[in-house]
Structures are given as C-alpha cells and as structure tokens.
C-alpha cells in the first residue's frame, strides 16, 4: 500500500520501530552543503516521528546528519536497521570512497559496515567493516572501476547465532557470506 514519497534523488530511506513505540527514520542527505560541512558527499540522517502518517518528504529531507561515521571523501547509507534490547539501533550499511588507480578510472570501493546508534544522544559505537568484495565469491564486474564494490543488501539472522550477509557484487551479482553476529546487544 502506497503511503508517502521521499525527496527527489534520496536513497537509503529505512524505518525502525523504537523502544517507546515511535518510528526512527534513516535517510541519506546528499548535497553541496553536506559536502562542505562534513567533507562527505552523502551522510546518514536520522529523525523520529510519532506515527507512520507523519512520514513526509520534509521529515526525510531534514533528518539530522549523524556525525562520525564517514571520513572526508567517504559516503554511505543505512541498508537495514534493528531495534536492540537496550534501545539502541543496530545498523547494517555501506561505506564508500574513491581510490585512485594509476592509468585507470578511480575505483569505487564499497564495503559492508555495521554500527550501533543511540537515537537519543546520536552516539555511534561498535562501528566496523563486516564485509569487503574480497570476502565474497569471485565474479565479473559491470565496469573495471566496480571490481572492489560490494553493496550491502542486508542480513538474515541464523539460529546458530551468526548472520548471513548479502551483498551486490561489482554491480553484477548477489553474494552471501556468513559473519559473526555484528552487534554487542541482542535484538529486541
């Protein structure tokens, strides 16, 4: 059922129910102001709404950028969000940067990341890389500059306490690897 439209060119809009019943909204603000202020072409933004009907393009567009996830020249987004038992949010996402290669087009490097986010204080903890292109099976690349790219699709929790991490490989195929449970706290 259709219920809203996000801002033009906005990717990585994800929702998560919070401990108090409100809804956390992740977005990916991307504009010249963001790049000038943070040195990153795209950040992860966060806002809280009371009801699904409150989700508008203005809420998504004006979500507060979360600082400290990306360094200068990096960008990324939230691909999946889980409420943790302690009220924080476990996030699976992607982190990206361009890597110069002599005599070639710069590589677009995308890695799979996880971190824990406090929706009250905006503190980011336990941030780590959970997968890179080299962790996945070998395969073709759509273009040479995408050979080191794995775009995070999401994770599926397993009964053995691990997780299956899915990622788009070099813009051509989908792969799966098994990783340790990425968060320091159980899911709610």
What are these regions (language model features)?
Residues 1-11, 16-73, 83-145, 158-162, ...:
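Beta-rich carbohydrate-recognition and catalytic domains
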């Amino acid at each position: 059922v259709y219920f809203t439209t996000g801002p033009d060119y906005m990717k990585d809009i994800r929702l998560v129910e919070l401990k108090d019943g409100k809804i956390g909204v992740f977005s990916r603000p991307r504009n010249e102001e963001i790049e000038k202020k943070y040195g990153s072409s795209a950040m992860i933004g966060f806002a809280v709404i009371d009801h699904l009907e409150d989700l508008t393009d203005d809420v998504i567009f004006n979500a507060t950028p979360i600082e400290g996830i990306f360094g200068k020249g990096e960008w990324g987004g939230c691909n999946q969000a889980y409420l943790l038992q302690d009220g924080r949010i476990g996030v699976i996402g992607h982190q990206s940067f361009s890597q110069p290669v002599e005599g070639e087009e710069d590589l677009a490097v995308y890695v799979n990341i996880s971190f824990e986010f406090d929706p009250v204080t905006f503190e980011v903890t336990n941030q780590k890389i959970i997968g890179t292109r080299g962790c996945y099976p070998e395969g073709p690349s759509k273009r040479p500059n995408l050979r080191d790219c794995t775009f995070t699709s999401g994770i599926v929790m397993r009964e053995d306490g691990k997780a299956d991490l899915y990622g788009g490989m070099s813009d051509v195929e989908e792969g799966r690897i098994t990783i340790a449970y990425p968060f320091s706290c159980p899911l709610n």
